[in-house]
C-alpha cells in the first residue's frame, strides 16, 4: 500500500503545487516542492491503477470493520522528533511515509481515525494511540478517544 499511497500523495501535491503563483514558490517547504515535482511525472495510467487499488483496500477495510468496533494502533511508528525534518536523517526509508506508517493506510482507505496522547517515552517524548472505525463512524471514533483520555489523564 505504500506505493499506492505515495502515488496519490505525490500526484495530489503536484496538483496543489501547480496552483502556487511563481513568485511564491520560494516560500514553499522544500520537501513539499520535491514531492510535488516528483508527482508531476506520475503517468495517468499509474494514478488510475493506484485508485483501483485504493478502492479495493477501502472495501477490504470496510469488511474488516464490519466485524470490529475499532482498530487501535500506535499513532506513529517512531517517537516525536525535531522539526523541520520529516523524519530523522538516519532513516533510510521514504522519508515522507516512514513516520506515518500507521496513519497513511487509514487515510488511503478513508476510514475515520483519531489520535490521542497515551503516554511518554523514556526520553519524555509523546506517544499517541490511534482509534479507527468504519466509514461514517466519525462520532464513534471521537467518543472512543474522548473516553480513553478521560480514563487515562
PLM features: what roles do these ranges have?
Residues 1-7:
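Acidic helix-start/capping segments at beta-turn-to-alpha-helix junctions
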Residues 5, 49, 80-100:
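Short, surface-exposed loop/helix-turn segments at secondary-structure junctions
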Residues 7-62, 112-125:
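Short helix-loop capping/hinge segments that flank enzyme active sites or metal/cofactor-binding pockets
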Residues 12-28, 100-101, 137-150:
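Short, basic, helix/turn surface patches
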Residues 42, 48, 59, 67, ...:
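Structural helix-boundary/capping segments
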Residues 76:
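Short glycine-/small-residue-rich Rossmann-like dinucleotide-binding loops
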Residues 93-116:
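Small-aliphatic-rich amphipathic alpha-helix that forms the alpha element of a beta-alpha
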